[in-house]
């Protein structure tokens, strides 16, 4: 922890450094993980189950080394909060090559929207406007899951 404290940037004298450090220590990271709106899929069975159990599914096919994937990730989390009628999942294409091959994913990020187990839209690339428009169309008339 002392290395972390020393590596903090110098804060303006008007800001209380100890208050800042206390706020970092109080952050409950485990709680934010549990409340995430985008769920990691670990295997093909989980993927099939997510499609079967939800009326609208938004799939984010990403790679850990992909810069645009990292850039759009916070926006995808925000969209998951804005559209509760859709179930948001993500797969790492390097971890699940059979699923990504089955879906025909050729570039990252690729977003595929399923409605009633059928693919209804695909957005290739980090295009938040196109993604939101596709989600809006898919969730139209769908009630949020309780």
Name each region found by the language model.
Residues 2-57, 137-146:
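N-terminal leader/targeting and pre-domain segments
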Residues 68, 75, 85, 99, ...:
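Residue-level recognition of specific faces of alpha-helices
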Residues 47, 58-59, 76, 88-91, ...:
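Structural signal for hydrophobic/aromatic residues that build the beta-strand cores
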Residues 45-48, 97, 129:
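Acidic phosphotransfer microenvironment of two-component signaling modules
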Residues 107, 112-146:
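Non-catalytic, surface beta->alpha helical segment in thiol-disulfide oxidoreductase systems
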Residues 40-42, 61, 73-98, 105:
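Thiol-based oxidoreductase modules, predominantly thioredoxin-like and allied folds used
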Residues 48-78:
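Local sequence-structure signature of Cys/Sec-based thiol-disulfide redox active-site neighborhoods
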